[in-house]
């Protein structure tokens, strides 16, 4: 609830939706480069490269923030882009795909990483490949949405209006 008014004020919901998808795509690409790849010596001494681990955690934090922001924008966007009689139908579709994405992220991607690890005997490599697959999927969705999601006239930033004041933000909160 606290972040939502800022999303409304700063840019359009379409812009937030696509930009957050781009940010998540970039984060997943960077994750393929930062997943710790300790040397045999580090493995033997049971130490890890903390700087790469820290960067990996930072990228996951950015991804979580982008995902939450995307959710806020997408919730508002479909209400602007669809006629009222189609909104209930879309809620069902969106909920279904949200659940499928959870299963894919928590099940299929983990199974892919596990299968790669079994064949390669390299855990970091298996996760780098899995993050790359995720980055490709997110990038494809972002590219598609950039060109094909509608541009409703009612999707406007409220920056510069009375709704953009700090008082209005806290009143809404």
What are these regions (language model features)?
Residues 59-64:
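Helical-face signature of the major facilitator-like transporter fold
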Residues 11, 34-35:
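Helix-breaking motifs and short loop linkers at transmembrane-helix boundaries and internal kinks
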Residues 25, 35, 40-57, 69, ...:
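Intracellular loop-helix junctions on the cytosolic face of multi-pass helical membrane proteins
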Residues 8-25:
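Cytoplasmic membrane-interface "Motif A"-like loop-to-helix N-cap segments
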Residues 65-82:
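Intracellular juxtamembrane helix-capping segments at the cytosolic ends
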């Amino acid at each position: 609830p606290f972040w939502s008014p800022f999303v409304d004020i700063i840019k359009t919901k379409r812009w937030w939706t696509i930009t957050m998808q781009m940010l998540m795509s970039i984060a997943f690409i960077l994750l393929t480069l930062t997943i710790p790849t300790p040397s045999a010596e580090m493995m033997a001494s049971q130490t890890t490269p903390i700087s790469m681990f820290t960067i990996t955690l930072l990228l996951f934090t950015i991804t979580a923030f982008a995902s939450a922001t995307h959710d806020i924008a997408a919730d508002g966007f479909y209400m602007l882009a669809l006629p009222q009689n189609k909104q209930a139908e879309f809620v069902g579709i969106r909920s279904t795909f949200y659940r499928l994405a959870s299963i894919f992220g928590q099940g299929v991607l983990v199974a892919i990483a596990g299968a790669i690890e079994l064949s390669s005997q390299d855990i970091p490599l298996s996760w780098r490949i899995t993050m790359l697959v995720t980055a490709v999927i997110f990038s494809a969705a972002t590219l598609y949405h950039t060109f094909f999601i509608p541009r409703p006239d009612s999707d406007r930033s409220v920056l510069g209006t009375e709704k953009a004041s700090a008082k209005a933000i806290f009143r809404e909160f």
